[in-house]
């Protein structure tokens, strides 16, 4: 196990998470509402979120939210996919919202430039006001925070929640917006109470050479964020992500003793689908971890699961890396260390 002061590890964002979420709720979400007001004035009826990595997964979650509770046309597209295969419809009734923490992601900047050239409303969500991405967008929000999963998810959710509220109100959207007020306290509770459990699960998972992550519903994008982005980039663990409903269509054939699985189990309508996969796997291997939203939700809406489930996964992945004697901040290639 790596001997390290966790307060020095940039990967671990639990320390200031609650304060950052409180700040975004009080200061930045109203700025999102101002942008949405302009979108409504311009009769925007199609939204393209463009991002990469974790920010893309946050945007995908918001896209699923829109699909579930509205007929709003929302897309979440990877940067180069947007640039290389630019949507046929890109005009003045479209919005292109680029999400990039450092604001230097070239393909996201290029996507905003493409959108602006076609007359689309453009906005950027980034950490700093002087980020390069802000010059490519008509509107920008610099959130000045480090817990990017929570922040990006909150900002993208706020776009969708406000658009639905203004254009086609839905009872569930009102419940989600109301429960968001309780988010800081709920996150704080998990930060305080889940570290030891995360340590135990991280130690267990550190013995596995790779991990299959399985999720469904609103947790699908978080499954990718944790099972691919976090495991590969930060813990140097081989990973693969499977959608719960697709588990029986091929993946079930690799289940056998010793094969490791991590399940993210929500309490939305897709719960039974993931439970079916869990039951199948548990009969054939003991290497199973289940993170269950029902056990940590504190009564919050099922579509807030991606916010809360992040905390157990943050602790698990941090300790997984530490037990593998790896500092999750260490890189071999990423961030310009090697030309790509």
Swiss-Prot record:
The keyword Hydrolase applies. It catalyses: N(6)-(6-phospho-D-fructosyl)-L-lysine + H2O = D-glucose 6-phosphate + L-lysine. Homododecamer. Its EC number is 3.5.-.-. It comes from the Bacteria. GO terms for molecular function: carbohydrate derivative binding; glutamine-fructose-6-phosphate transaminase (isomerizing) activity; hydrolase activity. InterPro entries: GlmS/FrlB_SIS, SIS_dom, SIS_dom_sf. Pathway: Carbohydrate metabolism; fructoselysine degradation; D-glucose 6-phosphate and lysine from fructoselysine: step 2/2. Residues 35-169, 201-331 form the SIS domain. It comes from Escherichia coli O157:H7. Catalyzes the reversible conversion of fructoselysine 6-phosphate to glucose 6-phosphate and lysine. Functions in a fructoselysine degradation pathway that allows E.coli to grow on fructoselysine or psicoselysine. GO terms for biological process: fructose 6-phosphate metabolic process; protein N-linked glycosylation; UDP-N-acetylglucosamine metabolic process. It holds the Pfam family SIS. This is Fructoselysine 6-phosphate deglycase.
